[in-house]
Amino acid sequence: MFTMIDVPAWLLILMLLFAAVTALDRILMPSVRWYLRRRLERAVERLNKRLSIPIQPFKLARRRDTILRLRYDPEVAKAIVTYAREHNIREDVVAERAERYAREIVPSFSAFTYFGFAIRAARFLSRSLYRVRVGTENTDALEAISPDATVVFVMNHRSNMDYVLVTWLAAQRSALAYAVGEWARVWPLQPLIRSLGGYFIRRKYNNPLYRKVLARYVQMATEAGVTQAVFPEGGLSRTGALREPKLGLLSYIIDGYRLGESRDVVFVPVALNYDRVMEDRTLIRANTEGARSFRFSLKPIYRYLRNLVWQKITGRVHRYGIAAVSFGQPMPLSAFMIDHQGHAETLGDELMGRISEVMPVVPFPLIAHAVAAGVRDRAALTGAVQARIDHARAKKAPVHLPRTDLDYTIDAGLNAMKLRKMLQVQDGTLILTNDGAEIMAFYARSIAPLMQDFAEGSRDTASI
């Protein structure tokens, strides 16, 4: 036992290295992990004190624990047995598939990434691209929501900037959990979105096992009080108009709700509108060609950042106009269940109606609505736009103008349209290009619900 042996130096170094790694892994690392976790918990406690809606423990749970909880959920277990029987597949194989679905769905939220990086990045990007305006805030109604209720922000989907804009504007209230489509399952978006609490869904995948796993995750998060953001339209509007609601996530929330037993759910309608939607031409082309999906590309982002740097250097920064957000009247699910017996279709229609009521009115859609209605004379355009502003304000819709000078606002809008080759102005007459007519209609439809009963005797009736 005490006999001396010769060991090569390289082997001794290797043995010492393995011993050091083992000591770190078994002795030091658990203590370090415990210390870091305690630091994180204290940081979250301090953060929760300044948030209107605290970050829930469910959101902070280890991702692996949530996956296993979902995998062994009784309802998922029943779905596994049913699926195995119907498709003549072994239950253990189906169980592995259910766990794979759970790994695909469950996020890995990082409070540091969300509040340390994402909020700052969202604020910078939003302010770089747009002049951000908040219309109807409904502050009193939002503050009156019970702290024990689960808040679900329900939004129209105009642009992929919606995620960025609402993440920043809701930062003082809570951390939002988004359902994100398959378009974003590319590097580096996928790991970033997971760390921000977003979960990926296959919108058109009707596999009953997958749907059950997804439904149970949504129901668990809702019952745990996780603040969520939902786009009931299920995708970007390709026509500019509000789309019919798709009821998947809303129906999961309703199905998991038990009146008088479950934690109450409060839906908060959020309306978004822009002077310029970055994807407008892509959406219009997809609608014309009947394309079913979009391929995500980093090229437009790279191109914009390159132009932004150049504009900063030359001192000529041009933003895309106004991006406006309005919050509608909150709707508790408990009251809805009593009044409507919990029909998801009725809930979807009611929420989309509340969104349209507070749709922000911004200059570009105002001008587009008048031009799409037939106004071609520049002198008549001022009166036509003013009539629409008066009509929107009479309906208590939030109207956002960059200045009180309406002629300046219209001239700025027309200049932007000319730069984008949508129209030309010759001798005071507006001449639309073929591309411009489609884009005008796209933006006009965003405020069309507010203008449905536009007075027949309005100042531009002769031009319509």
Segments and roles (model prediction):
Residues M1-A229, G234-I464:
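Membrane-interfacial terminal anchoring regions of lipid-handling membrane enzymes
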